[in-house]
Amino acid sequence: MKLAVYGKGGIGKSTTSCNISIALAKRGKKVLQIGCDPKSDSTFTLTGFLIPTIIDTLQAKDYHYEDVWPEDVIYQGYAGVDCVEAGGPPAGAGCGGYVVGETVKLLKEFNAFYEYDVILFDVLGDVVCGGFAAPLNYADYCIIVTDNGFDALFAANRITASVREKARTHPLRLAGLIGNRTKKRDLIEKYVETCPMPILEVLPLIEDIRVSRVKGKTLFEMTESEPTLQFVCDFYLNIADQLLTQPEGVIPRELGDRELFNLLSNFYLNSSNSTNTTLKNETNLFDLV
């Protein structure tokens, strides 16, 4: 099974990806996580350091694939999850899709691309140009990480359009949305009501999720010294269990930008007005007492 994780930049894709990878490993699967971001920090919380990228390694070997060995680019992280960082082209030049293609090509040279139960692509931000949509060419499922905000849902909608387009020529489905670190889920639910798709999980606003990134550890590793965090790990285990059932998934239908803006803004404004009216009525009742 091959997964591609997308979402707005800074939404917590890498943190989510690393914890899902471990959850899948905890369920007995052999997992490879491939970071597809020029920052090359997707697997940081799995390994505890920034591993060499495939592109940097190939450049050092003058692109002689026969001189590159699996141990040069594949590093084992926490819970036995194997890690690869694709790297990226020089700033302002090249294409991220080419980098992903070179990564897959090299892994196939090692016969490694097919020896894993699960391969998870953690992909740069919300860029859905042909290049950074390249991991969708290899994926069985796309997962979108979002929160309950306008910007993240706009990004999710654009990614949804990319999934629909790729599904025309590839056996790709959207597994669903993951809400990350959010107090509410009303905007997410409103969006899903209009564009039907599964919600795999909504993680609460827990500071330890963000702190884990700073510490260079996953929630699972932090739980070893802080057992009270086990309930957070259970969210990721639930996501893993859903994915391992190989869900049918959906070919989503995105909204137009203006349509989405009107949907979310009207819902938000109506909710705010309703809250204000309720507060005003409660104040009037208090005055009567």
Swiss-Prot record:
<dbReference type="GO" id="GO:0019685">
    <property type="term" value="P:photosynthesis, dark reaction"/>
</dbReference>
<keyword id="KW-0411">Iron-sulfur</keyword>
<dbReference type="GO" id="GO:0009507">
    <property type="term" value="C:chloroplast"/>
</dbReference>
<dbReference type="GO" id="GO:0016636">
    <property type="term" value="F:oxidoreductase activity, acting on the CH-CH group of donors, iron-sulfur protein as acceptor"/>
</dbReference>
<comment type="function">
    <text>Component of the dark-operative protochlorophyllide reductase (DPOR) that uses Mg-ATP and reduced ferredoxin to reduce ring D of protochlorophyllide (Pchlide) to form chlorophyllide a (Chlide). This reaction is light-independent. The L component serves as a unique electron donor to the NB-component of the complex, and binds Mg-ATP.</text>
</comment>
<comment type="similarity">
    <text>Belongs to the NifH/BchL/ChlL family.</text>
</comment>
<dbReference type="GO" id="GO:0036068">
    <property type="term" value="P:light-independent chlorophyll biosynthetic process"/>
</dbReference>
<comment type="pathway">
    <text>Porphyrin-containing compound metabolism; chlorophyll biosynthesis (light-independent).</text>
</comment>
<feature type="binding site">
    <location>
        <begin position="10"/>
        <end position="15"/>
    </location>
    <ligand>
        <name>ATP</name>
    </ligand>
</feature>
<keyword id="KW-0602">Photosynthesis</keyword>
<dbReference type="InterPro" id="IPR000392">
    <property type="entry name" value="NifH/frxC"/>
</dbReference>
<keyword id="KW-0479">Metal-binding</keyword>
<dbReference type="InterPro" id="IPR027417">
    <property type="entry name" value="P-loop_NTPase"/>
</dbReference>
<keyword id="KW-0408">Iron</keyword>
<dbReference type="InterPro" id="IPR030655">
    <property type="entry name" value="NifH/chlL_CS"/>
</dbReference>
<protein>
    <recommendedName>
        <fullName>Light-independent protochlorophyllide reductase iron-sulfur ATP-binding protein</fullName>
        <ecNumber>1.3.7.7</ecNumber>
    </recommendedName>
</protein>
<dbReference type="GO" id="GO:0005524">
    <property type="term" value="F:ATP binding"/>
</dbReference>
<keyword id="KW-0150">Chloroplast</keyword>
<feature type="binding site">
    <location>
        <position position="39"/>
    </location>
    <ligand>
        <name>ATP</name>
    </ligand>
</feature>
<feature type="binding site">
    <location>
        <position position="129"/>
    </location>
    <ligand>
        <name>[4Fe-4S] cluster</name>
    </ligand>
</feature>
<feature type="binding site">
    <location>
        <position position="95"/>
    </location>
    <ligand>
        <name>[4Fe-4S] cluster</name>
    </ligand>
</feature>
<keyword id="KW-0934">Plastid</keyword>
<keyword id="KW-0004">4Fe-4S</keyword>
<dbReference type="Pfam" id="PF00142">
    <property type="entry name" value="Fer4_NifH"/>
</dbReference>
<feature type="binding site">
    <location>
        <begin position="180"/>
        <end position="181"/>
    </location>
    <ligand>
        <name>ATP</name>
    </ligand>
</feature>
<comment type="subunit">
    <text>Homodimer. Protochlorophyllide reductase is composed of three subunits; ChlL, ChlN and ChlB.</text>
</comment>
<keyword id="KW-0560">Oxidoreductase</keyword>
<keyword id="KW-0067">ATP-binding</keyword>
<dbReference type="GO" id="GO:0046872">
    <property type="term" value="F:metal ion binding"/>
</dbReference>
<dbReference type="InterPro" id="IPR005971">
    <property type="entry name" value="Protochlorophyllide_ATP-bd"/>
</dbReference>
<dbReference type="GO" id="GO:0051539">
    <property type="term" value="F:4 iron, 4 sulfur cluster binding"/>
</dbReference>
<keyword id="KW-0149">Chlorophyll biosynthesis</keyword>
<dbReference type="GO" id="GO:0016730">
    <property type="term" value="F:oxidoreductase activity, acting on iron-sulfur proteins as donors"/>
</dbReference>
<keyword id="KW-0547">Nucleotide-binding</keyword>
<keyword id="KW-0460">Magnesium</keyword>
<feature type="binding site">
    <location>
        <position position="14"/>
    </location>
    <ligand>
        <name>Mg(2+)</name>
    </ligand>
</feature>
